[in-house]
Regions:
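Conserved Rossmann-fold NAD(P)-dependent oxidoreductase catalytic core, especially the SDR/UDP-sugar
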Residues: 27, 85-132, 149
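Alpha-helical membrane-targeting segments
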Residues: 169-191, 243-276
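Short-chain dehydrogenase/reductase
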Residues: 77-81, 112, 123-135, 164-168, ...
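Conserved beta-loop-beta element that borders a ligand/cofactor-binding pocket
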Residues: 103, 135-160
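N-terminal Rossmann NAD(P)H-binding glycine-rich loop of SDR-like oxidoreductase domains
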Residues: 2-24
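Mid/C-terminal beta-alpha module of Rossmann-like enzyme folds, strongest
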Residues: 2, 201-265, 280, 292-310
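Substrate-positioning beta->alpha
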Residues: 162-169, 183-206, 213-217
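NAD(P)H-binding glycine-rich loop region in Rossmannoid oxidoreductase-like domains
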Residues: 34-94
């Protein structure tokens, strides 16, 4: 049994399709998990409760931790350490391997490309929390108590989801005939992971015996685009003029007074100030895939949004 903790998210939905195509038995787990085509079973569970986590993971051989929490540092601080601790304990009891799908918040502001060897140096509260839970998992596999892995992604975009900053700020507005937006600086390159690539890499990593007990950056196309280039390609796919506005820090600070999500996002704006370069060469060397070209990914994502807007 392969168990996915965190049903309904962009990566989880893609992952279910891939695993179902391999005729794998799949258990989907979430607080309010709904039946999903391809899943063998669906379980509602609160992973902050140890007993529920143990029950949800029981009988699993591989567990994917793909949980998404409300974007709130207080909720993250309270819930993430408990979720990680309970999931690790549940995997130990089940004898299951654990893959944690992570982000890059723990690296902090990096000069140059982010690699798997980049030290943790968080400059945000959310980054501190992610560093803490990632370190917890790494220490478990280093001690030999658990077989684990971290698969880390850049900011992402892709079809079949309304999640991801480019989807919200670029694809959705264009699909509605509106002007797009970009965060802070549209002139610096910003790596973006294509969600189908991320899901495919999770399957490949789990199936590669030598990939365990390591951190991997999932395949993300090199030579990232600047915001203005990304918007221009997206506009072309929608057949519209590349009209957009840049959301600068002062505007976002004011907006945060009225919108809790914007307020929570403010501490992460350092990622948009300067080049945001995500290096996945380790994966490319091992698996021979460097990521879907941006033009193709943007075309597919735009097609998905156009289909939904009809």
């Amino acid at each position: 049994m392969i168990t996915i903790l965190g049903a309904g998210g962009a990566i989880a939905n893609e992952l279910v399709k891939l695993l179902a195509a391999r005729n794998q038995p799949i258990r989907l787990v979430g607080r309010n998990a709904k039946s999903t085509p391809g899943a063998t079973e669906t379980i509602a569970a609160d992973l902050t409760d140890k007993d529920q986590a143990i029950s949800a993971v029981s009988g699993s051989s591989v567990v994917y931790l793909l949980v998404g929490l409300k974007y709130d540092r207080k909720i993250w601080a309270e819930m993430w350490p408990r979720i990680m601790s309970n999931t690790i304990e549940a995997c130990k009891r089940a004898g299951a391997k654990l893959i944690f799908f992570d982000n890059v918040y723990m690296y902090g502001k990096v000069s140059g490309p982010m690699t798997e060897e980049t030290p943790f140096n968080p400059c945000s509260k959310k980054g501190e929390i992610r560093a803490k839970i990632a370190t917890t998992l790494i220490n478990e596999w280093k001690s030999g108590a658990l077989t684990g892995m971290i698969a880390r992604s850049a900011d992402f975009y892709g079809p079949a989801t309304r999640n991801g900053v480019p989807n919200v700020l670029v694809f959705e507005p264009f699909s509605q005939g509106k002007k797009a937006s970009w965060l802070v600086n549209d002139s610096v390159p910003h790596s973006l992971t294509y969600t189908p690539d991320a899901a495919q890499s999770l399957v490949q990593l789990a199936e590669r015996a030598t990939a365990w007990n390591q951190t991997w950056h999932v395949p993300t196309t090199p030579n990232p685009l600047a915001g203005k280039e990304f918007v221009a390609l997206a506009a072309r796919e929608f057949g519209v003029a590349p009209k957009y506005r840049v959301l600068r820090r002062p505007i976002l600070r004011i907006a945060g007074w009225f919108d809790p999500l914007v307020a929570e996002s403010y501490e992460m704006l350092y990622q948009s100030d300067s080049p945001y370069l995500f290096d996945s060469n380790k994966f490319a060397r091992e698996f021979g895939f460097a990521g879907t070209p941006y033009a193709e990914g943007i075309r597919n994502t735009a097609a998905s949004f156009k289909a939904k807007s009809r």
